[in-house]
């Protein structure tokens, strides 16, 4: 029997404990679980972690074979110097599907100009015929598991999709660019810009005033990566001068977004309260169980975090 420590809040423990146990049983693995203090640290085989968990010294888990994150983002833990165990980020089908649906919905909303009809004056019959998707350029920043899935789906709808990442990628139907020197090229054609990048030292304020100025006039931005990707002040300035017509933001530097933040009152900002890619309990439990099964059988862990890259 393996021993799992849930380094999570009591609420998350109640939500995930039984689904993960059931997912493990389907794989013929029996487990004992507990919160910090329930099981001796030196007896723990795996740590299931979420931001805000009470333990931040992972050095006590001398037997632990891996730390398995419940969330896709690991920027809050990756720099922890006591964490010497393999760290795995969450990648699961529900997370991927949720992100694709959110990106497609808001890309189509921007592409079709739906806001003008939702907000139009009563009795105003004003026709605005948008171009077809084949004549609309979309750039996706970040081509990991989620970004690649979104880019592939948008290309399947006919959009002219450019993808940009730190390292070279190949995605059917997507023009892929890589490296800092190709970022201006990726931004220059982005009538709709979709950001799905993680937070790393290289991505903080990636979209600053200088880079926002490279976007085509009247572009739209969707940010479902991390709030730190965009300089808030520079974005508001770009909206005010018409460089950007709308920004749909799912992530923010501080969450929940403070009540006095100017994003709330800006007519060009749509606030989506971090719902683009929520972790689904059942599919996430299967993903955790899959990785534990792999480790128990001696197979390589999936979705290992590269500490040098911070994701």
Task: List the predicted regions and their residue ranges.
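Rossmann-like dinucleotide-binding domain for NAD(H)/NADP(H)
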Residues: 218, 224-311
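NAD(P)-binding Rossmann-fold cofactor-contacting core
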Residues: 156-173
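Short, well-ordered coil/turn residues at beta-beta hairpins
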Residues: 50, 70, 196-199, 224, ...
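Glycine-rich NAD(P)-binding loop of Rossmann-like domains
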Residues: 116-149, 176
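Short acidic low-complexity segments
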Residues: 31-43, 56-57, 174-189
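Rossmann-like adenosine-cofactor binding region
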Residues: 168-262
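Phosphate/diphosphate ligand-binding glycine-rich loop within oxidoreductases
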Residues: 45-118
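N-terminal glycine-/charge-rich "phosphate-binding" loop or analogous flexible N-terminal tail
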Residues: 1-46
């Amino acid at each position: 029997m393996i021993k799992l420590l849930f380094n999570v809040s009591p609420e998350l423990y109640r939500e995930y404990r039984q689904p993960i146990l059931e997912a493990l049983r389907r794989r013929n693995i029996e487990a004992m679980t507990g919160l910090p203090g329930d099981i001796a640290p030196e007896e723990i085989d795996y740590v299931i972690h979420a931001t805000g968990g009470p333990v931040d010294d992972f050095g006590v888990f001398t037997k632990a074979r891996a730390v398995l994150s419940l969330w896709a983002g690991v920027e809050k833990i990756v720099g922890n110097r006591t964490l010497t165990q393999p760290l795995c980020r969450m990648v699961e089908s529900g997370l991927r599907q949720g992100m694709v649906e959110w990106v497609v919905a808001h890309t189509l909303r921007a592409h079709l100009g739906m806001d003008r009809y939702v907000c139009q004056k009563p009795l105003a019959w004003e026709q605005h015929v948008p171009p077809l998707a084949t004549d609309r350029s979309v750039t996706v920043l970040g081509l990991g598991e989620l970004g690649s899935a979104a880019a592939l789906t948008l290309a399947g709808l006919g959009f002219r999709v450019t993808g940009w990442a730190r390292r070279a990628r190949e995605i059917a139907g997507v023009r892929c660019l890589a490296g800092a020197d190709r970022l201006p090229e990726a931004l220059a054609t982005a009538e709709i810009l979709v950001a799905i990048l993680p937070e790393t030292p290289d991505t903080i304020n990636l979209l600053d005033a200088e880079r926002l100025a490279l976007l085509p006039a009247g572009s739209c931005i969707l940010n479902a990566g991390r709030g730190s990707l965009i300089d808030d002040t520079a974005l508001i300035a770009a909206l005010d001068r018409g460089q950007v017509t709308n920004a749909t933001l799912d992530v923010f530097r501080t969450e929940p977004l403070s009540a006095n933040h100017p994003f709330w009152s800006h007519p060009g900002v749509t606030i989506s309260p971090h719902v683009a890619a929520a972790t689904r309990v059942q599919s996430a439990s299967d993903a955790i169980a899959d990785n534990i099964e792999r480790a128990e059988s001696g197979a390589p862990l999936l979705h290992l975090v590269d500490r040098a890259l911070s994701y």
